[in-house]
UniProtKB/Swiss-Prot annotation:
Part of the 50S ribosomal subunit. This is Large ribosomal subunit protein uL24. The gene is rplX. It comes from the Bacteria. InterPro entries: KOW (IPR005824), Rib_uL2_dom2 (IPR014722), Ribosomal_uL24 (IPR003256), Ribosomal_uL24_CS (IPR005825), Ribosomal_uL24_KOW (IPR041988), Translation_prot_SH3-like_sf (IPR008991). Belongs to the universal ribosomal protein uL24 family. One of its GO terms (molecular function) is structural constituent of ribosome.
Length: 104
């Protein structure tokens, strides 16, 4: 299945503790159906001291289900993503609310 949410997209969280917050997708895990979003779903991790890094408690992003994310259109609202095939044969994503093309 084609990816509706890709690395670098700006998304809005639909449900959960961070509902309504938006951020940029850092990484997508298609096999798990999850993604990492910058500044969303932060968890505290207890880091052990190493030669390179200090020990302590750090905040980092945890994975969030793709079903809880929606692409953010140019108006800043969540939208569904569809696919169109252009005249030259390329398959591109578009925002269903505005009809604007997302890719190339």
């Amino acid at each position: 299945m084609a990816a509706k949410i890709k690395k670098g997209d700006t998304v809005v969280v639909l449900t959960g503790r961070d509902a309504g917050r938006s951020g940029e997708v850092i990484q997508v895990l298609p096999k798990d159906g999850k993604a990492f979003v910058r500044g969303v779903n932060l968890v505290k991790k207890h880091q052990k001291q190493t030669q390179n890094a200090e020990g302590g408690i750090i905040s980092k992003e945890a994975a969030i289900q793709l079903s809880n994310l929606a692409f953010q259109d140019v108006n800043g609202k969540p939208t569904r993503v569809g696919f169109r095939i252009l005249e030259d044969g390329r398959k591109v994503r578009f925002a269903k609310t505005t009809g604007d093309q997302i890719d190339g």
